[in-house]
Curated annotation (Swiss-Prot):
InterPro entries: KH_dom-like_a/b, RbfA, RbfA_dom_sf. It comes from Salinibacter ruber (strain DSM 13855 / M31). GO terms for biological process: maturation of SSU-rRNA. SUPFAM superfamilies: Ribosome-binding factor A, RbfA (SSF89919). This is Ribosome-binding factor A.
Amino acid sequence: MSVYTERVAELVQREVARILQREYADRLQPMVTITRARVTGDLSIAYLYASVMGDTAEEREATFRQLESLADEIRNQLASRIRHKVREIPELKFFHDESLEEAKRMENLFDRIREERERRLEDGEDSADARE
């Protein structure tokens, strides 16, 4: 990616995040965070990675589908904010960023491993005490 496309990607990410926070916070529940953005070399498409916070997978999926349905509306608002900074307003394509969910799964896995080790250590100590 060229320096210009990187700057445009950063600008799009920042402005879309602001738009979501200020204009759509009440409509997009639970909270949506734009974690990353990439822009094609010709600046025609912006790929936005969104993390959706929610208690259930169904809730997160419904919010993400709603976000996708708002893409054109968000693009229009983006255009009014950045049209003087870029030659073309890119089409917005949203992707579900599961990195936070994956991190949570990994943390839970490590917790289970830690608990299993502690249990084995306790069992080992109990066995050693019984032999004495």
